[in-house]
Amino acid sequence: MACAVFQIPPWHLDRKYGSCSTILLDNSTASQPDLRHTLERYANRSLAIFEEPVHPLPQEKLPGKSFKHDPKRNCIFRHFCTLFQVIKLTAPCAIVALVYIKRLLTSANIDLCPTNWKKIVLGTMLLASKVWRNHGLWSVDDSQNSKDTAVENMSKMEKCFLELLEFNIHVSASVYAKYYFDLCALANDHDLYFLFSFLHKDKAQKLEGHTSQHSLSLGPCRVGMENYATYSPLSSQPVLGALSLAEVLPQEIKQEIHQVLMDHGVPCHYTCFLLHPEDSTLERFLVLHSIQGLQEDSVLCKVEIHGLSPQPQTYQSHFRSPSLAELLNRISGTCRNHFAGMQK
C-alpha cells in the first residue's frame, strides 16, 4: 500500500474535487472569467509581430534585459498585470486578444520569439479592448497604456494588425467558449490550479445563467424537463444548455421519444455518460461537453430517460436554439399520445 501511495503525484493529493454531495467551484465561468486566473493561464501564451530591438517599446535601456532567452511565465504575468491595470481591461479582453494572436499565427505565418511578444500583446489588447467596448475609440484614449509609445506608433500598429488579420475581428460565442475552456485545460495540464470553495446560495446567484423548468402531468407519470443554459457576453442567444427528462417514464415510450428526436433532425446517439439530477451542476456539464463540436448560437441538448432498465438512457446533440421550444413540444406530444392510447 505504501508503494502505491508514493506513485500518486503529490499535487493530486492536495486537490479537491466536486462530487454528487459537494460542489467545489472557483470564481471563474465562461461568461464571467476571473481576471487573475485568466492572466495566469494566458501567461503561457505570447506571440510576436514586430522586432522590439528595431522598434523598442521602452525608449530607455533596461538593466539586465535579454532578447536571447524566452521570458519566464512570471515575467509575462507581471507584464500582463501592469498592462491591465493601466488600460483597465477585463478578463474577457484577454481571451479575445488570444483569439487574435492565434489568427495572426495562421494568416501572417509569424512565429513566437522573445524579442517580439510585448508588441504583439500590446497590439492585440488594444484591438480587443476596442472591439469589446463595441464603440469607436480614438487611439489617444488608450495612449496612457505606455508612456513611451507614441499615438502615431499605436495607430500604425493597429493598422498593421488589422491588415494581417484581414479585418477578421469577429469572435463568435462558440470560439470564445472554446478558448476559455482550452485555457482551463492548459492550466490543469501544467498543474496551475486554484483554490476552490463550496458552492453556496449567494455564490450560485452570481453565476450568469438562466434555468427554466417545465413540468407536465401525463397519465400516471410526471415528466420534468429542464433547460439550463449560460449566456456569453458576445451573444444574446444561449450558448450551452441541457434538456433533461428526469422523472420516471415507461419503458415502452423510450423508442418513441428517440424517434421524435430523429424526426426533428437531431443526430442523437447513446452515450455512457449519465448525468443524474443530483450532480447536474453547470460547471461539471460544461467541462465535459462544451469544447468539441460547439457551434455558434447552438444548444447542447441532453435527454435522459429513466425507464424499467436499471440504467437510464442518455441522448445528447447540438441544435439551433430556436428549436428548443419545438423539441419540448414534440416530446410532450409523444408522451401525451402514448398515455392517451393506453387509456383507450
Swiss-Prot record:
SUPFAM superfamilies: Cyclin-like. One of its GO terms (cellular component) is plasma membrane. InterPro entries: Cyclin-like_sf, Cyclin_N. The keyword ATP-binding does not apply. This is Putative cyclin-Y-like protein 3. The keyword Electron transport does not apply. GO terms for biological process: regulation of canonical Wnt signaling pathway. Residues 40-170 form the Cyclin N-terminal domain. Belongs to the cyclin family. Cyclin Y subfamily. It comes from the Eukaryota. Keywords: Cyclin. Gene3D superfamilies: Cyclin-like. Pfam families: Cyclin_N. It comes from Homo sapiens. PANTHER family: CYCLIN Y, ISOFORM A.
